[in-house]
Amino acid sequence: MSNPDDLDDGLAYDFDAEHEVIFDAKDGSPPTKKVQKRSIEQDDDDVDDIDGKKEERNSEDDSNRPISKRQKKLQKKSKLIEKKKEESQYIVSQRKALPASSPEKIIEYLTTLIREKNPDLSVLELEELYFKRNDFLSTEKFDAERRLSNFPAFIQKFSVAPKKIVFSMSNIRVADVYRSLNGGKNCVKLFSKSKLKDDIATVERLLTDSSKKSNKNKDSLYFIATPTRMQKIIEATDLLFQGKEKLDIILDASYLDPKDNTILSFENAAVLCQVLKTFLNKKSSVKILLY
C-alpha cells in the first residue's frame, strides 16, 4: 500500500502554523514557501502590554515602598501651607464683606476684637467697651463698589450730619480720601505729617468759623484722620464734643493695605475702638457708618 504522504494530489497540507507551502496544480512547478509575518500593529500591542505591566508593577512597588521621614515632613508641611492659605483667603473675604454687613454682624466682629485686645479685663469692664445696635447706621443698601471714586456718592446717600469724621488707617490713605472729596476749605487732613498743635489749631478754627454761620449757609465739615492722631486731638481739646449738632463717623473699612489688613484689623484697631467709644460717651447724636 502506498503512503498517503507520497501522493501528489495537488493539494496543500499545513504542517507548520507559521509556514504555508503552496503547490501550483497547473504547471507542476516546485512548491513556493511563503512565511506568514506578524503585523506591526500586533508587535506594538505586545510591546504596549509589556510596558503597561512594567508600569503597573512599578506603580505597585512605589505604593508599597515606605515613605521616608523627610518625605513625611514635606507632605505635612505642604498640607499646613495649603490650610493656612485657605484660612487666609477666608479671613480676607470676611474683611471685605464686613462694611456692607448688618449692624448686628459689625457689632459681633467688634465684640470679638475688643475681647482679643483686652484679655485681662473682667466681663463687666468689657461690657463698657462694647458697642450697641443703635450706635451704627446700616449701609447695606449701597450697591456700588466701595472704592474712592464712589465715596462722595456714598456720603450724599447716607450721611446728613453737618460734621463728619472720616477715619482711615494710614497717612497715605488719609490723603487719598481727602482728594476724593476734592479737598477745600471745609475739609481737613489730620495726621502725623503735620504738627499736632497745627492740627488742633485747624480744628478750632473750622469749628469756630462754622458756629458763626447760619444753618442755611453752613457746609459740611470733614475731618479726615488716623485713629492715633484723633486720639491725641480729643485729649487736647473738647471742641469736637460740643454742640447738639449731629456727628457722623465714617470708617474707611473697605480699603485693604498690602498685608490685607483693614482699619478694623490693623495694629491700631484697638485705638480706633477707644476713640469711637469716647465720641459716643461725650457727644450726643453720634452715628457710625462703614464704607
Curated annotation (Swiss-Prot):
Residues 22-79 are annotated as: Disordered. GO terms for cellular component: 90S preribosome; cytoplasm; nucleus. InterPro entries: Cms1 (IPR032704). It is found in: Nucleus. The lineage of its organism: Eukaryota, Fungi, Dikarya, Ascomycota, Saccharomycotina. This is Protein CMS1. Belongs to the CMS1 family. Keywords: Nucleus, Phosphoprotein.
